[in-house]
């Protein structure tokens, strides 16, 4: 019988120890972003988007969607936007949904503050990562922030001036940043419309976005000709006017009434925009008075609403915390209905100063502030909120129809 070979003794191989992490892996992540408020408060976080420093008024926006539209809305010029919804940037960005009409200028927004770190985009329409997109537009981002606490601070103390800063190495000159925040004069008395407005006339014919075909072009002959004055005009307002059958010509903020009327419009639109209405009104309000006197239908939104009120004899004032979001309830006194609206303003028409003959048509159900006016006996009206819904609900699209009906009536 053959002998069995002796069993081999196999020494078990020692398990390979995982490499010990370098000390730096255990360190607290480096702070690369700061928000420094005018009262000296320093809020630490992580920078993304553009690097550098920018000063502005810190506000909060409660919309859950539409961050790209918000950050390209010229009405946010001079502001640092805090998003209360925690997940921002997760559907990426594209070049189609930009709201700035004047592509030669930036929207003017100074920065954005978010809670969660920005993730890779997951959306079939996305062209670029949110952080990369911010970098190309020169907008500073700050993540890792307790946005609920910051929002409560704004609600209690008002919208503070502040500096948002992003440096990859975390090298900050706190003394300098605090001085910048404390010395910035704020938005009162600031005319920002001139910085975001077109500088020359433009024709517009793009229509609203469709699931099948995207943004389109007006088909057929327009039924009405509208001149839109650009104080910081959003594209979706122009699309809504085009959808309503209007041929739209856009003119700069400093356009004179005589030049506007020489275009022989059926109606005149006064757009949204940033800054203090009294400051922009220095040159705009006298022209608006002439437009109202012409008898042409006039429709205003946001800054256009405020300056129309000034032209009719009312006054405006700075708000404590402003209205920024897509969930603001407004009551329409003409119908008795309540609509959910999109808002973005830090100034408001003082309802106590509305003169005789100017009727309050809409009011905020949050704080009772004025949200709409109409001039008795004339086709002139305006609203404080954004009926074009970008972002936001579409409850107020009827206002564009109302404008068209007034033009129909004026034409006979």
Regions found by a protein language model. Give the residues of each.
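Residue-level structural signal for beta-strand termini and adjacent loop
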Residues: 47-48, 86, 344, 375, ...
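Residue-level detector of beta-strand face positions
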Residues: 34, 73, 329-331, 372
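RNA-binding accessory domains that recognize and position tRNA/RNA substrates
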Residues: 2-263, 275, 390-395, 401-412
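Active-site-proximal beta-strand elements of phosphoester/diester hydrolases
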Residues: 225-230, 341-342, 381-385
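Short solvent-exposed loop/turn micro-motifs enriched in small/polar/acidic residues
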Residues: 26-29, 323, 355-356, 365-366
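Catalytic beta-strand/loop cores that center a nucleophilic Ser/Cys/Thr
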Residues: 336-378
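Cysteine-nucleophile active-site neighborhood
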Residues: 262, 267-351, 392-410
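Proline-centered loop/turn at the N-terminus of a beta-strand
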Residues: 140, 225, 297-299, 315, ...
